[in-house]
UniProtKB/Swiss-Prot annotation:
A GO cellular component annotation in the UniProt record: ribonucleoprotein complex
Purpose of the protein: This protein binds to 23S rRNA in the presence of protein L20.
Organism: Bradyrhizobium diazoefficiens (strain JCM 10833 / BCRC 13528 / IAM 13628 / NBRC 14792 / USDA 110)
SUPFAM superfamilies attached to this UniProt entry: L21p-like
Superkingdom of this protein's organism: Bacteria
Upper classification of the organism: Bacteria, Pseudomonadati, Pseudomonadota, Alphaproteobacteria, Hyphomicrobiales
Region (Disordered): 102-129
GO BP term, pick one: translation
Recorded family membership: Belongs to the bacterial ribosomal protein bL21 family.
Assembly information from the UniProt record: Part of the 50S ribosomal subunit. Contacts protein L20.
InterPro entries to which the protein is assigned, alphabetical: bL21-like, bL21-like_sf, Ribosomal_bL21
Name the record gives this protein: Large ribosomal subunit protein bL21
Length: 129
């Protein structure tokens, strides 16, 4: 099953367990957020929305908030000794799709538990250094 969602003025084709980067969405890291602008729900019998599918939503887990790569906007007017250089970095939210819901259903899955980092065991080479 897949869905086409709209967020931040862009459209994304998503399936369960997909990880995607979108424009900033409010929500704490590790929380579940519902995206209600679902344009298409696909599967055995696809449902097209006009413009959105009624009662459909996508539950996503917020994995991280970060900043995107730097974008440079450089303008130059030739022979005029006029130039302007500006740059910016977008705020990005990293999401993992938990479930695709239809018929006003509530999300059944909660946030996934975080994996604990395993500490390296000291070896003879590390002790000698």
């Amino acid at each position: 099953m897949f869905a086409v969602i709209k967020t931040g003025g862009r459209q994304y084709r998503v399936a369960p367990d997909d990880v995607l980067e979108v424009g900033k969405i409010e929500g704490e890291v590790g929380s579940i957020v519902q995206l209600n602008e679902v344009l298409v729900v696909g599967g055995d019998t696809p449902i097209l929305g006009l413009p959105t599918v009624a009662g459909a939503s996508v539950a996503v887990e917020v994995l991280d908030h970060k900043r995107g790569p730097k974008v440079i906007a450089f303008k130059k007017r030739r022979r005029k000794n006029s130039r302007r250089k500006r740059g910016y970095r977008d705020e990005i939210t990293v999401l993992r799709v938990s479930e695709i819901l239809t018929d006003n259903a509530k999300p059944t899955k909660g946030p996934r538990p975080k994996k604990e980092k395993v500490a390296k065991e000291a070896t003879k080479e590390d002790a000698a250094a």
